[in-house]
Amino acid sequence: MDPRETTDPSLPPGPLTHLSLPDSSEVRLQSDGPSLLGSWTRSPPEHAIILREGVRTCLQQRCEQTVWILHAKVAQKSYGNEKRFFCPPPCVYLAGPGWRVKPMQDQALQSAETGPTVCGYMGLDGASGSAPETQKLNFEEQPDSREFGCAKTLYISDADKRKHFRLVLRLVLRGGQELGTFHSRLIKVISKPSQKKQSLKNTDLCISSGSKVSLFNRLRSQTVSTRYLSVEDGAFVASARQWAAFTLHLADGHCSQGDFPPQEGYIRYGSLVQLVCTVTGITLPPMIIRKVAKQCALLDVDEPISQLHKCAFQFPSDTPGGAGTYLCLATEKVVRFQASLCPKEANRALLNDSSCWTIIGTESVEFTFSTSLACTREPVTPVPLISTLELSGGGDVATLELHGENFHAGLKVWFGDVEAETMYRSPRSLVCVVPDVAAFGSDWRWLRTPITVPVSLLRADALFYPSPFSFTYTPEYSALPRLPNAQEPAPDADTLLESIHHEFTRTNFHLFCPT
């Protein structure tokens, strides 16, 4: 509480939040340049006013640009002259309205030009100083306004001895301006799918409940016939062009479809599972996942599932003892296939080629930024990524530590349209002072509901980096001013307000991101 505000009895007894900025903050180091390691920085007042208006416009107009890289967790190595192209192929989506909003300095330059507004080149990160081959991406606009590009001919040869690598995406704007270089998550290199019985002693290649997977089918093991399970127009399809990532959940057979409690643990054959599209949220009914060998579903196998295993998905049946129906593709449609029991082995069901799927784990990484404020032609990368927030302190002052990657000394933390004093610690840590809630409006003293503001980062050249995080201020109880002839409050009003006070006298932060 600020002691100066208690001298006037007409004022309420203190702020409605336990987070406030002490006066000593005014004499801290102020600078609009990159901060030194361990020093607090804030933009000068004359710059802060301009920046605040620009950040407010960014937040209101939603002019962000997102680069989304989607790829498999593992890649099979190629030997000799063979080329085992990555399957599913790495793909890139460009999303957000900012791709259609050009910075002022580029509008005149690009108005007379035609052709794609951005070009992409994807390859493997370099090994031992060698220049990796890259593949050009041809972006196509999707019905949902996203741009889609796919690298279908990438592979890793046996001359590359690495156990892990990353994909590198280079984006260039029309006119030759370098937008940036973006990296994927780590990809594990394997020689071939494991044929041994899997054990939970080595979980490196096992698939856990809640992880993301892709499913594809190859008729007669021919690469040209590859079809991927995907979602289009609200329906499941088998696509030769695009693939989707699905969250694979262990399901509870006693719950209704779409209302199952997620369970932890590694997925085993014979488990009841449910596939949920990570983009649309559309689900398939709960199904039993079966191991496939020689085009037969093995009904008595319960070992853990491994990367690039052949599997089948059986729909639960009310008639025990039957072979059951299985998830199957028919050209581009997804249908049910009625299997039959193997004449010689009752614990096997005969399938057709279209009912046998290959399962593989997937990864994705999103980079979001906005160039609408920036007066620079510098690349937007490295894009800072926030992974977690850690709140410390309370009462008169609180600090928030941002954990993530790609941080540098030229970044400032913003709460909504309010800049926070920021200290750079390391490429994985930024610390800021939580702004006083009074900075968000003159009516803050009488608030009875929480205030939630987005947490963003701003580079020294005004390049804006939104994040999926937000920060919530929660009010503390204080008496409202009484109006003349106002009705006396109910006897239990104080008790009610006190209970609200106990519920909300905490400051919380929440992560809002797609699941």
UniProtKB/Swiss-Prot annotation:
<feature type="domain" description="IPT/TIG">
    <location>
        <begin position="384"/>
        <end position="474"/>
    </location>
</feature>
<dbReference type="Pfam" id="PF20144">
    <property type="entry name" value="TIG_SUH"/>
</dbReference>
<dbReference type="GO" id="GO:0005634">
    <property type="term" value="C:nucleus"/>
</dbReference>
<feature type="region of interest" description="DNA-binding">
    <location>
        <begin position="218"/>
        <end position="223"/>
    </location>
</feature>
<comment type="similarity">
    <text>Belongs to the Su(H) family.</text>
</comment>
<dbReference type="InterPro" id="IPR036358">
    <property type="entry name" value="BTD_sf"/>
</dbReference>
<protein>
    <recommendedName>
        <fullName>Recombining binding protein suppressor of hairless-like protein</fullName>
    </recommendedName>
</protein>
<dbReference type="InterPro" id="IPR008967">
    <property type="entry name" value="p53-like_TF_DNA-bd_sf"/>
</dbReference>
<keyword id="KW-0539">Nucleus</keyword>
<dbReference type="InterPro" id="IPR013783">
    <property type="entry name" value="Ig-like_fold"/>
</dbReference>
<dbReference type="InterPro" id="IPR037095">
    <property type="entry name" value="RBP-J/Cbf11_DNA-bd_sf"/>
</dbReference>
<dbReference type="GO" id="GO:0000978">
    <property type="term" value="F:RNA polymerase II cis-regulatory region sequence-specific DNA binding"/>
</dbReference>
<dbReference type="GO" id="GO:0003677">
    <property type="term" value="F:DNA binding"/>
</dbReference>
<comment type="function">
    <text>Putative transcription factor, which cooperates with EBNA2 to activate transcription.</text>
</comment>
<dbReference type="InterPro" id="IPR040159">
    <property type="entry name" value="CLS_fam"/>
</dbReference>
<dbReference type="InterPro" id="IPR038007">
    <property type="entry name" value="RBP-Jkappa_IPT"/>
</dbReference>
<dbReference type="GO" id="GO:0045893">
    <property type="term" value="P:positive regulation of DNA-templated transcription"/>
</dbReference>
<dbReference type="GO" id="GO:0005667">
    <property type="term" value="C:transcription regulator complex"/>
</dbReference>
<feature type="region of interest" description="DNA-binding">
    <location>
        <begin position="191"/>
        <end position="196"/>
    </location>
</feature>
<keyword id="KW-0010">Activator</keyword>
<dbReference type="GO" id="GO:0045944">
    <property type="term" value="P:positive regulation of transcription by RNA polymerase II"/>
</dbReference>
<dbReference type="InterPro" id="IPR015350">
    <property type="entry name" value="Beta-trefoil_DNA-bd_dom"/>
</dbReference>
<feature type="region of interest" description="DNA-binding">
    <location>
        <begin position="76"/>
        <end position="86"/>
    </location>
</feature>
<keyword id="KW-0804">Transcription</keyword>
<dbReference type="GO" id="GO:0001228">
    <property type="term" value="F:DNA-binding transcription activator activity, RNA polymerase II-specific"/>
</dbReference>
<dbReference type="InterPro" id="IPR014756">
    <property type="entry name" value="Ig_E-set"/>
</dbReference>
<dbReference type="InterPro" id="IPR015351">
    <property type="entry name" value="RBP-J/Cbf11/Cbf12_DNA-bd"/>
</dbReference>
<dbReference type="GO" id="GO:0003682">
    <property type="term" value="F:chromatin binding"/>
</dbReference>
<dbReference type="Pfam" id="PF09270">
    <property type="entry name" value="BTD"/>
</dbReference>
<dbReference type="Pfam" id="PF09271">
    <property type="entry name" value="LAG1-DNAbind"/>
</dbReference>
<feature type="region of interest" description="Disordered">
    <location>
        <begin position="1"/>
        <end position="40"/>
    </location>
</feature>
<keyword id="KW-0805">Transcription regulation</keyword>
<comment type="subunit">
    <text>Interacts weakly with EBNA2. Does not interact with any Notch proteins.</text>
</comment>
<keyword id="KW-0238">DNA-binding</keyword>
<dbReference type="GO" id="GO:0000977">
    <property type="term" value="F:RNA polymerase II transcription regulatory region sequence-specific DNA binding"/>
</dbReference>
